């Protein structure tokens, strides 16, 4: 499998590098943002690498993106960085479908890119230019660690402000399609938060394709625990959704 590692896509943070896992087919390019609560995680995580290789084996070129983390970042730096990563990939693969996904904190980033239209809009990219969005157990309300680091608040609080993807949902919401992957034993409130997001979007635009899958297990188990067939449920369910 051909790969390109540690491609610098931005000069904002020393962590702003990405890896590309090239597929032999051209089914599309998947841009992935890892989880870790904005304090941890990177593209070298063994699970993340295996996920990248799995998607490439299914015909999707896969992009693992690193971004700045606390305590060496401030909101919205990692969102600006993420938008630059998308810009780089759009320019690198101008004729392929682009999909954006993420796990936990990475799903939060993906949601922000989708619903805060200014982030990608600065680079001439609209949410509709992305062929699909996959959010694995993201937090659509204000992220708990952003409440902690940015506002000094109790991370258990529920807030909808400029730190929340939900804050940007309005009558102009428009996207190709989205998949929400959630878990039966997810983080407290995570299922309910995502139901609120889905219903808020549908309230403005009932015709949008917003699908959801509820998997067995704890928070993001589908991208950290393989099934008996050796594949991650997150990968399998995403592939099924993309190709149906």
What are these regions (language model features)?
Residues 32-35, 64, 180:
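Structural cue for short, hydrophobic secondary-structure segments
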Residues 29, 56-66:
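A fold-wide structural signal in alpha/beta-hydrolase
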Residues 24-54:
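Short, surface-exposed "cap/lid" segments of acyl-processing enzymes
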Residues 42-51, 63-97, 228-229:
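Catalytic nucleophile-loop/oxyanion-hole region of alpha/beta-hydrolase
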Residues 84-149:
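Primarily recognizes the serine-hydrolase "nucleophile elbow" in alpha/beta-hydrolase
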Residues 1-25:
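N-terminal cap/lid segment of alpha/beta-hydrolase-fold proteins
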Residues 204-244:
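C-terminal catalytic histidine-bearing segment of alpha/beta-hydrolase fold enzymes
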Residues 125-127, 132, 138-146, 157-195:
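The feature captures the conserved acid-bearing segment of alpha/beta-hydrolase catalytic domains
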């Amino acid at each position: 499998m051909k790969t390109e590692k540690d491609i610098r896509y931005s000069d904002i943070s020393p962590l702003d590098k990405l890896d590309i896992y090239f597929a032999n087919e051209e089914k599309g390019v998947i841009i992935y943002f890892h989880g870790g609560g904005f304090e941890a995680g990177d593209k070298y995580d063994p699970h993340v690498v295996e996920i990248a290789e799995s998607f490439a084996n299914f015909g999707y070129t896969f992009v693992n993106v690193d971004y700045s983390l606390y305590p060496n970042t401030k909101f919205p730096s990692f969102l600006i960085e993420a938008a630059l990563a998308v810009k780089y990939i759009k320019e690198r693969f101008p004729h392929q479908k682009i999909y954006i996904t993420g796990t936990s904190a990475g799903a939060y980033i993906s949601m922000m890119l989708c619903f805060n239209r200014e982030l990608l809009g600065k680079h001439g990219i609209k949410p509709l230019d992305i062929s699909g969005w996959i959010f694995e157990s993201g937090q659509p309300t204000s992220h708990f660690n952003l409440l902690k680091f940015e506002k000094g608040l109790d991370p258990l609080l529920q807030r909808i402000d400029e730190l929340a993807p939900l804050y940007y949902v309005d009558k102009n919401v428009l996207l190709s399609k989205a998949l929400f992957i959630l878990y039966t034993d997810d983080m407290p409130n995570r299922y309910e938060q995502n139901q609120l997001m889905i219903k808020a979007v549908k309230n403005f635009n009932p015709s949008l394709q917003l699908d959801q899958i509820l998997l067995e297990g704890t928070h993001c188990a589908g991208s950290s625990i393989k099934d008996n067939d050796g594949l991650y449920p997150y990968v399998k369910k995403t592939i099924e959704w993309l190709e149906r």
